[in-house]
Structures are given as C-alpha cells and as structure tokens.
C-alpha cells in the first residue's frame, strides 16, 4: 500500500500545484524528495502520527503543511490516505467529496482533480482509472450532457488532460456498445440544432467519434455532410451552411462542407434538375434568388459542367425547365430590386433577353412579361423600363423585322391618352434619379407625335389642354406642349406652327379671348398672353374671318351697354384695324357692325351715354359723327332722326345734334 500512498500524495501535490492560489508555492512530489519506501502501510493505520511506523513521514516532506492547508476544509490528506488504505471505491469518494451536487459544473470544482487523483491511486493503470471515472459519471449524466461537459473541459488547460482521457474512454464504450455515428448524432440532438449545429460544442465530440468509428468499421464509414443530409435534407443542409458562412467562427467549416456536399451529389449522379428539387427551389416563389440554396445550386451547376462536359448547361436553361417566361420573369424582376440579388438577376435577365430576341418575342410581349403593364403612373421609376427600352432597341436591329416597334407605340397602346404619359415624364424630370429616363421617354414621345399625328395641334388635344380652361398657361402640360412645339418647328423649317393654333383648336373665339385677357392680368403670364393675343389676331386674319361674324363669335351682341369699355370689344377692334390694313379698298366700319348688331336707337343711346364718360367720350364722339354720316347716306330725314334721338338724349342735346344732322342732310341731298 506504500506505493499507492506515494502515488496519491504525488497526484495531490500536482493538484495543489494546479489549483493553488498564486502565493502558494508548488509542492514537490514524493519521488523528488526521496521519500523512503521501506515497507507497506499496514491496513487501518491512518497517516499522521504513525507515519514513521509506515516508513513514510509525510509531515517531514517539504510542502506537506501547505498541501494539508490547501485541502482544508475538504477531506484532508490523512482522510484520503485512510480511504485509499480502506480501498474505498472512487464512486463512494465521489459522493463523500459532494461532487454529486455540482451538476454540469463538475469539472470546474476544485475537488474534481482530487477525486481524479484518488481514483488514479487506487487503479492499476491510467486506462483503468479513466474507465472507473467514466462509469461513475455515466451513472449520473446522459451521454449528451456528459459529452458537452467534457467538450467544455477540454478547452481549459487545468482539465484538458483528464477530459481528453475521459472522452477517449467514453468513445471506447460507445464502440463496444456498437453505437453508430448516426446513433450518437441523435443522442447529442444534433438533428435539432439547426443553424447552430456547426457552433455546437457537441459537434467536435461527435466528429471525433465518427473518425474513430470509421477507423474501426471501414465498411460502414460515414461523413458529417452525409449524416447532416440524412437528418436535415439537402435543402436544410444548404440553408445551415449558408448561415454558417456568415460567422467567422464557422465560415471555414461551412466552405469545406459545401465542397463535400457538391462531391456527394456528384458521386450520387445528381443532375442540376435533381438538386433544384432536392433544395426545394421549386417552391421558393418570388424569393428564389434570395434563397441561400440558390447560390448552392448555381455552384453545383459549375461543378456539374466540369464533370459532365457533354451535358453542359446554364442556370437559365435549367430554370426554364422549371418555369415558363410568365413565371420566371416576375421572379427576376423582384430579384433586381434587391441589392443582394440584383447582380445575379441582371445576368440571368440579359441571357433571357437573348433568348427572347432569338424567338422574336415582340416588345409588346416583353413589356407585359416584365410587368410594366402593371406599373401605372410609376412606369418611369420602374427599373425594368430601362431594360425594356434596351430590349426594344435590340429587337429593332433585327433586319428580318418588317416593321419596327417604337417605345411610344407601346406606351400609347398601354396608357391610351398622351396626357398621362406626359404627366409621368414631367414628374420624373423633377427627380435626379429618373431625369435621364424621363428625357429618353420625352424624346420618344415627341418623335412619335411627329410621325403619327398630322400636325402639332393634335398634340394640344392629346394632352387634354382644351379641358384646363383659363389656367392653361400655368399647367405643366402647357410647358410640355410648347417644348414639343419648339422642337417641331426647329425640325420642320417652313412648316412652323404657332402656339395659338393649338389654343384655337381647343377653345372657341370668345373663350380663348377671355383666357388671354385673364392671363394678361397676371405678371407671370402677361408677356405670353400679349404675344398670344397678337397671334390670335393673325390667326383670325389667316382664317379670313369677317369682322361682323367675329363680333358675333365673341358674343359682343349680347349687350350694347358699356360695350366700348368691354376688353373683348377692344380685341375685336384690334382685329378690325388689322383686317382693314390688309384690305384697304373695302374697309369694314365699326359703326356698320354696331348698327347691324344693335340698331340705330340702341347705338345712339349708347353713344350719348359713352360721351359722358371721360374714358370713352372721344371714341363715342367719333362714332356719333360716323353714325350721322351713315344716316345721311341712308337718306334718313331729319324727322326720322329726330324720332331716334328723342328716345335717348335730353331735349337740348337732341336739338343741337338734330340741327347738325339737318345741315349735313341738306348739304348732301338739298
């Protein structure tokens, strides 16, 4: 028993050295101090006072007192020697040391190394000691829990050695019990770890056992990737590895397993179509490209092509075996809106467009497939529009196409009225990110109008400017129209059109005249309105409108009262003067129009009233003189004129004017 005591003392000395506070010096082993081993300890004699009788005087060993103090208030060295002398089973000592109360913190307890040392002292070999310890631990902990504790203990320098020995012994027992790696995968509940499996502390223990099992059972070898696939499926494993690649701690392992997964598929002869289904990508929907499994699948196609050059394929070709254009295109459209999938989607869409061009798929069909027909007023902010415009350009490059398709043709068919398209352009021009596409669509629209419409006036109507009314000059569509008109006139010298032409097409004479008069009152539109008023006069002249007719068109016949102060009358008068300047031989007289419209009495009364207003007195006097001259030419007798004058003017005024008329009449007719 003397050797056993020496071993125990030496082991405890090592424990003391390992777990002592910094100020406690290391206690040397018995061998280092040449402890005499003269005879075995007698059973039942405790260490201490009778040490010398045993041949081992522990009290005289340097460091003994420090070791004894370190073990307080734990069972002292003497008690341990007594237990060893009495051949107390390690399991009993485990309980005496209250290690059965430590739970999963067993390896952190300072009494655990004491127990380990005790067990080693009573065992014949290290291997036997490990087996005895494991037996004790297995009776208290499940394989899963104990393996986790051992894995944690291996990370500490204080417990690494004993934990490694326990793990080795644990695996020997599993092998003896014919437990497969798959059995232990379930025991460790790694089948439920999900995305955390690669960071699980139990994975290391399982991997070690797998390697040991493979060595012992070469005909039943397995791998981590094969076992994971069995429990999680190809799709689940791919998802786990994608998540693991994002963590620095598991990134390298994930990459290695991905490579193994690919090799596993190749070994099993999986085709890209097979793996597409295995990874559940056929059920991914619009999020297909965002699926972690999609990247795995694309990589597999590359490996597959290298291994099978005669069956070389592409990602798009394989996608088209699972989706038609109506299904795949929306998936790519969605993916191009997401930064993480935009690049991949762009490449696939470019390849898709090539296929469409080869199949002579029309721009109209492409417009619908790209879901641009559902964009509404957000068409110009849709990122797919640029791609579609490029496709349309490439489509028109095909020399076999009989008739080219312009973008604006498709737009107009989709949106029906040009005003909606124009409003979208106007809105997009205000946003920096869409200014370029807005300019492009604007050019397409202008080009389309020039080709399709007969004249610019049609554009005014197409933009529905005839419905705006007196605020037309403040409408963004008016500016859009005038911009087109300017470009049209520049491109068609000699065929220039005026702004008034479209206005006259959309509004009648009186409405347009009143609109211009209203616009002249606002500082922001005064200059434009004045210019347009002059253009309107010229437009009427070109249309050869007779002053009398225009007088009616302008609704001036409604009332003679205050007509000389009516702004519309002044516009008519401007036209009358312009008309007479253009036809000097046969001039139209204002008085004739007034007489025709209101009659002698009404005109006479109006002139009498107008002469009383300083603002119209002068023109009224001129018109009154013209009226008298007209009556003379009509051979109205002074009596007839007297009757007319008496209805409106005062007696004195009538008498004076009648005298003037009588003199004129006498001079002309005698």
Swiss-Prot record:
Phenotype when the gene is knocked out: Exhibits significantly decreased virulence when infecting soybean seedlings.
Motif stretch (RxLR-dEER): 39-54
Induction: Expressed at specific infection stages in a transient manner. Is not expressed until 24 hours post-infection (hpi) but quickly reaches the maximum expression level at approximately 36 hpi. The abundance of transcripts exhibits a more than twofold decrease at 48 hpi.
Keywords: Glycoprotein, Repeat, Secreted, Signal, Virulence
Location within or outside the cell: Secreted; Host cell
Cross-referenced InterPro entries: PexRD54_WY (IPR054463)
Residue ranges of LWY repeats: 127-217, 218-308, 309-399, 400-492, 493-583, 584-670
Region described as 7 X 93 AA tandem repeats: spans on this chain: 79-670
Database matches in Pfam families: PexRD54_WY
GO CC, one annotated term: extracellular region
Claim: Glycoprotein is one of the keywords in the record: yes
Signal peptide: 1-17
Residue positions the entry lists as glycosylated: 57
Free-text comment about domains: The RxLR-dEER motif acts to carry the protein into the host cell cytoplasm through binding to cell surface phosphatidylinositol-3-phosphate. The C-terminal region (residues 79 to 670) consists of seven imperfect tandem repeats, including one W-Y motif (WY1) and six L-W-Y motifs (LWY2 to LWY7). WY1 forms a 3 alpha-helix fold with one hydrophobic core and each L-W-Y motif forms a highly conserved fold consisting of 5 alpha-helices. The units contribute differently to the virulence since WY1, LWY2 and LWY6 are important for the ability to suppress the biogenesis of small RNA in host and virulence activity of the pathogen, whereas LWY3, LWY4, LWY5 and LWY7 are dispensable for PSR2 function.
Similarity field: Belongs to the RxLR effector family.
Subunit structure: Interacts with host dsRNA-binding protein DRB4.
Protein name listed in UniProt: RxLR effector protein PSR2
Organism: Phytophthora sojae (Soybean stem and root rot agent)
């Amino acid at each position: 028993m003397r050797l056993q005591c020496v071993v125990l003392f030496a082991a405890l000395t090592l424990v003391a050295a390992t777990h002592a506070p910094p100020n406690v010096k290391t206690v040397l082993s018995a061998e280092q101090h040449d402890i005499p081993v003269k005879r075995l300890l007698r059973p039942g004699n405790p260490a201490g006072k009778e040490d010398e009788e045993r041949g081992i005087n522990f009290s005289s060993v340097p460091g003994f007192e420090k070791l004894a103090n370190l073990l307080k208030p734990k069972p002292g060295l003497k008690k341990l020697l007594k237990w060893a002398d009495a051949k107390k089973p390690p399991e009993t000592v485990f309980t005496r040391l209250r290690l059965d109360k430590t739970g999963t913190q067993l390896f952190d307890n300072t009494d655990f190394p004491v127990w380990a040392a005790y067990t080693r002292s009573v065992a014949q070999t290290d291997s036997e000691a490990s087996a005895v310890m494991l037996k004790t631990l297995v009776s208290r902990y499940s394989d899963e829990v104990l393996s986790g504790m051992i894995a944690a203990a291996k990370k500490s320098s204080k417990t690494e050695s004993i934990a490694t020995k326990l793990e080795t012994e644990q695996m020997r027992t599993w092998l003896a019990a014919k437990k497969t790696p798959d059995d232990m995968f379930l025991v460790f509940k790694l089948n439920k770890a999900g995305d955390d499996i690669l960071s699980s502390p139990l994975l290391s223990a399982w991997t070690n056992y797998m390697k040991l099992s493979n060595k012992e059972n070469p005909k039943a070898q397995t791998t981590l990737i094969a076992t994971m696939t069995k429990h999680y499926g190809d799709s689940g494993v791919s998802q786990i590895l994608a998540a693991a690649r994002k963590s620095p701690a598991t990134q390298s392992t994930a990459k290695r397993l991905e490579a193994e997964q690919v090799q596993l598929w190749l070994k099993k002869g999986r085709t890209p179509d097979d793996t597409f289904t295995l990874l559940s990508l056929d059920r991914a929907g619009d999020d297909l490209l965002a699926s972690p499994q999609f990247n795995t699948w694309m990589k597999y196609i590359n490996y597959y092509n290298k291994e099978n050059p005669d069956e070389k394929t592409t990602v798009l070709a394989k996608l088209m075996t699972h989706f038609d254009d109506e299904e795949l295109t929306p998936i790519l459209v969605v993916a191009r809106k997401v930064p993480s999938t935009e690049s991949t989607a762009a490449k696939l869409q470019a390849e898709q467009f090539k296929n469409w061009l080869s199949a002579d798929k029309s721009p109209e069909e492409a417009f619908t497939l790209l879901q641009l027909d559902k964009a509404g007023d957000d068409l110009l902010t849709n990122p797919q529009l640029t791609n579609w415009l490029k496709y349309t350009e490439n489509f028109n490059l095909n020399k076999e196409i009989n008739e080219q398709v312009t973008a604006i043709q498709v737009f107009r068919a989709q949106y029906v009225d040009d005003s909606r398209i124009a409003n979208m352009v106007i809105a997009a021009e205000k946003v920096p990110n869409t200014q370029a596409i807005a300019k492009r669509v604007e050019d397409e629209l202008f080009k389309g109008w020039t080709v399709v419409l007969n004249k610019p006036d049609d554009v005014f109507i197409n933009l529905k400017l005839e419905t705006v009314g007196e605020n037309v000059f403040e409408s963004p569509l008016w500016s859009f129209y005038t911009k087109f008109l300017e470009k049209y006139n520049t491109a068609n010298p000699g065929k220039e059109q005026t702004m008034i032409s479209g206005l006259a097409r959309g509004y009648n004479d009186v409405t347009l005249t009143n609109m211009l008069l209203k616009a002249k009152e606002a500082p922001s539109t005064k200059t434009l309105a004045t210019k347009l008023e002059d253009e309107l006069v010229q437009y009427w002249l070109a249309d050869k409108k007779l002053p009398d007719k225009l007088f009616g068109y302008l609704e001036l016949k409604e009332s003679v009262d205050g007509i000389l102060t009516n702004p519309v009358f002044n516009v008519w008068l401007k036209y009358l003067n312009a008309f007479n300047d253009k036809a000097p031989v046969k001039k139209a007289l204002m008085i004739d129009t007034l007489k025709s419209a209101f009659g002698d009495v009404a005109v006479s009364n109006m002139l009498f009233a107008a002469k009383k207003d300083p603002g119209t007195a002068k023109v009224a006097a001129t018109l009154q003189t013209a009226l008298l001259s007209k009556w003379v030419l009509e051979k109205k007798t002074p009596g007839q004129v007297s009757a007319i004058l008496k209805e409106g003017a005062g007696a004195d005024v009538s008498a004076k004017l009648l005298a003037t008329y009588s003199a004129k009449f006498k001079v002309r007719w005698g």
